[in-house]
């Protein structure tokens, strides 16, 4: 990727969300690391559920997302290759619940704000429910972005919110 004298920078648009783990991309842009290496990078905030559409349309050339999302996209005909793993998350995701939910089984029949199928929050919620003898059919899903799920939960909407940092600590 090293830039050559007089060469024009290669334009690259990267789609990200507000998830903390994607911050190194913005930091690299702001620090001039991409530019120094011959890349003219633009960072676009695009919800995870829409990033595959932005890739397919050519609006972006790269997408920062989770590993399971790459698998889903490939399975659905979006030919992509994972280039790098930015980080490993051990605790940035979480399920916020109201005071009347003492155990996961108490979520049966409740409404949970969670991102679309194929996203990390959706996968996380499905995993939590499965580990507790439940499925997604046992709850009512209100599909919304992780930020919107946290905001709706704070506003008193929904019984729970599956989200991640930086939104999780606000609920």
Tell me the role of every PLM-derived stretch.
Residues 2-4:
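N-terminal signal peptide c-region/cleavage motif recognized by signal peptidases
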Residues 7-148, 152, 157-169:
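Short, glycine-/small- and polar/acidic-enriched structural segments
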